[in-house]
Regions:
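Alpha-helical interface subdomain recognition
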Residues: 1-124
Length: 124
């Protein structure tokens, strides 16, 4: 939910960046990835409900994509705020940006998660 609010904020208050086609493309890409992640999550939950099987490599994939999407959003938020302003929003966005860097590490680095996926799906 927080990611959707961040997307809405960026669309509404992106200011001069909304004039930049590359920046809008990046914003659109993150939005599409977030929607795809939500749909995938719902599919996994539905399959678990129907079959009673515990999640497998799905959880690792969700963790990887989720952290990548969060990092992409915070990068866009950082670009959309004026770091020189020093206002509460700019400070909060900088803190969030730095905090999101660690999400690829906790709960197992994304590289470890990729190894888990390879082992579970390919039997490596």
């Amino acid at each position: 939910m927080k990611s959707k609010r961040q997307l809405a904020y960026l669309k509404r208050y992106g200011g001069h960046l909304m004039q930049d086609q590359r920046w809008r493309d990046r914003l659109s890409r993150v939005e599409v990835e977030l929607t795809a992640l939500e749909i995938t999550n719902l599919r996994f939950l539905d399959r678990m409900r129907r079959t009673g099987q515990p999640p497998g490599a799905d959880v690792s994939m969700l963790k990887i994509k989720g952290t990548e999407i969060q990092q992409g959003l915070t990068e866009l938020m950082l670009e959309a705020t004026d770091p020189a302003a020093g206002d509460a929003l700019s400070v909060a966005v900088r803190k969030r940006y730095l905090s999101m860097r660690k999400t690829t590490i906790y709960a197992g680095s994304n590289e470890i998660q990729r190894n888990i996926i390879a082992k579970m799906t390919l039997g490596l």
